[in-house]
Amino acid sequence: GYNNESHNHNDVGSCVVYVRDIPVLVDAGVGTYTKQTFNHDRYKIWSMQCDWHNLPMINGAAQPAGAQYRSKNTSCDLSKGMFSLDLADAYPPESGCRKWVRTYRLAPKGAPSVTITDSFALDARTQPDVEHFLVKGSVVLPGGTHQGRTLPDGELLILCDEGLVVKMTFPASLKASVDVMELTDRRFSGVWGPSLRRINLASPPDAPAKGSYEFRITELGKK
């Protein structure tokens, strides 16, 4: 994909994840159409922006709009439940990104899970990376408690509709926080309810310029 498609959002490489038809990682979609939706201020609308999709900020930089910002080296193997693409060219030069290969893997057997891996190489580390995940549900962060258990570093829970509980594991070096987007536009709230939450997983300022992040999303059942 690339960031100059019809009705474009800056979201090359993003995904959605549902568990048993229940939304977990979501794409907010588009709000009520206004003049801004179709003019030069389009990308000031939050739902059009990279950082409100399931994508990273690389070295502090988000994906911009433009046909030159695109993925490359796309690969899909249905027999292995795997899809990957290099997002480096979807980010601006100031990101210093030489490689950012995102891989999605499905594990339908046993405990169903989705694993998202970002393997990267930067020219230099100038700012933290921040991985974003937009979720429908409340979030229990590391250090929080759920049903009497305190969550360790590198683990959070997403409490979804219909009592579904989903676990996300991630590198313990990433600092987790949550932002709440109140949905005042009825076109959003009619689909998602009163709010969505964005999980932010930030690397240390001095994180290596080469490495990988792995995120695993696993169903824990309904509780």
Describe every region a protein language model picked out.
Residues 1-223:
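Extended polysaccharide-engagement surfaces of secreted carbohydrate-active enzymes
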